[in-house]
């Protein structure tokens, strides 16, 4: 203790011992931490009051400066002001080193100054808000002894007063700026007499030693003058703190060149005073962690031990310090009421959350209500109108102009009043303003005006209808996004069911909205308002929702597809189809092109939802434990989280520096784990997307991650190419266990349903089971042995065990490797059953249904299969993905499953709907003959049988044959010819099905086959580089042999001549009667990929893998023109009917139109790239064809496109269900088109008349 302080205490020891009662004083000193309970007992043990006082003072004399100041403060608080006055002169300026409290500069000097100035103490339960406190202190430093105003403003209960007190609890600030002290005045809502009383009290405090202080000021003006004299002469470097100022006129009484810090709900209160002004808004509430910290302090528990309701309470409190403190104080009294208070918050029952405290109001609704009551009468109703705004929604000024029927400037003036009074918040975006309410303000208004809400929503809709037509809103309008997002909400809330149905069942609205915001929000609205929409027509609602769900991957892309054309692909009974047809017919009259898919009745779409959340391959996707959300990850290095029912995006996280290979929800859905090629494992908060942990102990890429199934103690397992498995406890920063045993990459891991075991799969050909508690290997099953034949040495056979999945009872496990799924008994390691999926594909992933015997299997040939694991029967074949399927997973209840693919999409399928699809799938080998009123399609199906399909009626004749590789029809539909994989060729006579077989055939698979015009001769080519000419009626053969490599294709010319092209880079012209070569053109360095012949048969074109195309004359050995400019393989070409134009298509999706006479480029037809690096046209352009008048061009690639040849612009796009179209067959009148996609779906399209 300082000598001055010690002497002062000794000097007045006798007076102190005579008068003080020690018990209350010791309470203060114990709470300050300067006296112990043991010391208190020693004092209490003394017999008389005098002896107890003497013992206490003796103890204080042996302590430090902090004990002296604590004793001084205790005397003040307990009413011994005269005795405290005796000790005042001995107060040390700073505490001694032994008792120094460096917490934010809160020294004993600071405590003394604040105590003298009447600054409130810290609340018993207190958490720091360092950023805001620092911001206030910075503004106070700016005053630097000069007059000025620092304003802390914010809504009711946001902690302004606590922040103001905390800001001055700083030694450096008080010593450097306010050495004259700090004086706190609580203002509140005052009239003139109340303000005069406040001023009188302040003058008395400041002028205690002045003679004129005996007479109080008689009016506000006198008080203002006296205050000015006191502040300038006696307290020149002091800070005046005015707490809770409501009215500007109040501040005029203090406007006398002082340094003032004030708290208020109304930012504009300082508009009426002079001098520098600084403003600190308190908008943001407490974060989740701070809120939990407050609750934990109130109930005296560790944060991690708080019940699950604590997190929900913080969420419902929206960060309000007042509400968190009120709830915490109530819970301290009633510790079992967590669920009750959560329910009151959720039901907006603020009246039931009441607690007396140092705050002026016992409940939040009281605090907010007083602010609203203070508004001018003429604008109160406008504030009531804001009751219909949704939380977290920023509303443009224009919306409120529509609602109130006022000019922009008038609306902005009204709203600024609300903003100034902290009843509304404003965001400036360029020249325009957006306004929003705090969540608690929304709750307060909703509860206060509950009886008026429907009328208020109706007013909003009615005003909208006065100003706008729903589908004519343009992106340039300031308010358009608000109406697209919330018009349906206002209609539903207004009870305007008829108007809501008209809106939601309008294709115009669907088109306009999806073009701007994508389909997910619309799907959400169909789900949200299903109960209303079903009142009109539940089938129509189903039609629209299904249309959006299944076309979501198209409707979210750029360029935006023609929604009317998509609608025409819906079933004819669908309301979407009927509206699209009506609209299309109107647009056809203005010259627009639309196509009808006339054979679509046979197609059933089995997916429930298709979403495209990624810009690259999707490697994994999984359901949350409640089945409400899906998380996905992939090659674009992101983690995406979206709603499982609607596809609405919830989180978009740039998760890793390299491809993300796997993701998993924790059992309580609180966290998502991701692992990556970058060797890292990361844990994310599944609600906020914040990074919680990063683990970096694997030395190679991490392939898989999986959480335990129970939430009582969360563990995460990861497997890596470094051959190790690791177990992670989320409460620890380092790996809990590393499991050694695999000799190659760990590809997959899964905890057993009871979490006792961990199964792991590896490229070493084994499945291992590990004891989770001890992290020891319990069992190793050699999966490779199930793939060995007797003659195979084990070391020569590589078996990568791709994945595993447990049965619900935990006794069995399925594993996938190569093309087999094996069901194993974990107790005996025995094989119970196996499923063989076929030789042509490998299994990528599999999952076991939680409630039945189904397994879903992803295959490399883009297909997903559902199998009954016990009966070994395939239950379903799910086609729809356009590339490899990397992941499959059942929902927790088994009612649906998801699939994730290289094609950037995730599909959700309903298990019960995906029954065995009896439709036979077509191969892409077809031939089409167009006759006057009919077309016939000859197709090869997946059982390698032949189907003869009447295009108009859809009637099918089956011509069963095995291993068909190609087929063709004779021009007059009298015969069918086909070649097979073994090189045999056959002809079937129609309609009696008599078969003629070629006696010679080819040595390898037949690839192309064609009748001559008279149908008497059949020409075929195969992989053996020979072209065979077979007059099947006379059994005469001619063999065209000269190509050095496989013949790519051929075309018949006039006069018994034939043009063929080959992988050897040459084009040859043959006489098919003699078998001689008439012309031999060495056309390209690379493979000749296609040739086209002009209609006058004088020219032909050749395209090549060398990125060029050439135009040739049959009479000249060198090309007429070499066409350069393509940046990839030129795969196809076609002449216009008059021979003036040539179109070429390449593997980048570009089509170029050239002038044949001079070889000049006329147009480049290239669809806009969807994503950087993605091929346009959905892939390679494989076929092109001009209309007879050469005004239009149709092209085949990933889908079909029609082009305006004059402008080079796209006229229409038809998105097929699958992709990779090989060829398009076009009728002579250019009105009918036939193709087959890679899913085996046949499209017969007709131009809509």
From Swiss-Prot:
What this protein is called in its record is: Apoptotic protease-activating factor 1
Q: What's the domain of life for this entry?
A: Eukaryota
Query: What are the record's GO terms for cellular component?
Result: apoptosome; cytoplasm; cytosol; nucleus; protein-containing complex
Q: Which lineage? A: Eukaryota, Metazoa, Chordata, Craniata, Vertebrata
Q: Where is this region: Interpropeller linker?
A: 910-921
On assembly, the entry states: Monomer. Oligomerizes to a heptameric ring, known as the apoptosome, upon binding of cytochrome c and dATP. Oligomeric Apaf-1 and pro-caspase-9 bind to each other via their respective NH2-terminal CARD domains. Interacts with UACA. Interacts with APIP. Interacts (via CARD and NACHT domains) with NAIP/BIRC1 (via NACHT domain). Interacts with CIAO2A.
Q: Which InterPro entries match?
A: Apaf-1, APAF1_C, APAF1_CARD_dom, APAF1_WHD, Apaf_helical, CARD, DEATH-like_dom_sf, G-protein_beta_WD-40_rep
**Which GO annotations describe the biological process of this protein?**
brain development; cardiac muscle cell apoptotic process; cell differentiation; cellular response to transforming growth factor beta stimulus; forebrain development; intrinsic apoptotic signaling pathway in response to endoplasmic reticulum stress; kidney development; neural tube closure
What's the domain remark here?
Answer: The CARD domain mediates interaction with APIP.
Subcellular location(s) per record: Cytoplasm
Q: Which UniProt keywords apply?
A: Apoptosis, ATP-binding, Calcium, Cytoplasm, Nucleotide-binding, Repeat, WD repeat
Q: What induces it?
A: By brain injury.
The entry's other comment says: Physiological concentrations of calcium ions negatively affect the assembly of apoptosome by inhibiting nucleotide exchange in the monomeric form.
- From the record, what ranges are coiled-coil? none
Q: Which organism is it from?
A: Rattus norvegicus (Rat)
Please give the function described in this protein's UniProt entry.
Regulates programmed cell death; necessary for normal brain development. Participates with pro-caspase-9 (Apaf-3) in the cytochrome c-dependent activation of caspase-3, leading to apoptosis. This activation requires ATP.
Q: Spell out the molecular function terms from Gene Ontology.
A: ADP binding; ATP binding; cysteine-type endopeptidase activator activity involved in apoptotic process; heat shock protein binding; identical protein binding
- Domain NB-ARC, which positions? 106-415
Q: In this protein, which residues make up the domain named CARD?
A: 1-90
Binding of ATP occurs at 154-161, 265
Looking up SMART domains in the UniProt record yields: WD40 (SM00320)
State the WD repeat positions: 613-652, 655-694, 697-738, 741-780, 796-837, 838-877, 880-910, 922-958, 959-998, 1001-1040, 1042-1080, 1083-1122, 1125-1164, 1176-1213, 1214-1249
Q: Reply yes or no: does the keyword Zinc apply.
A: no
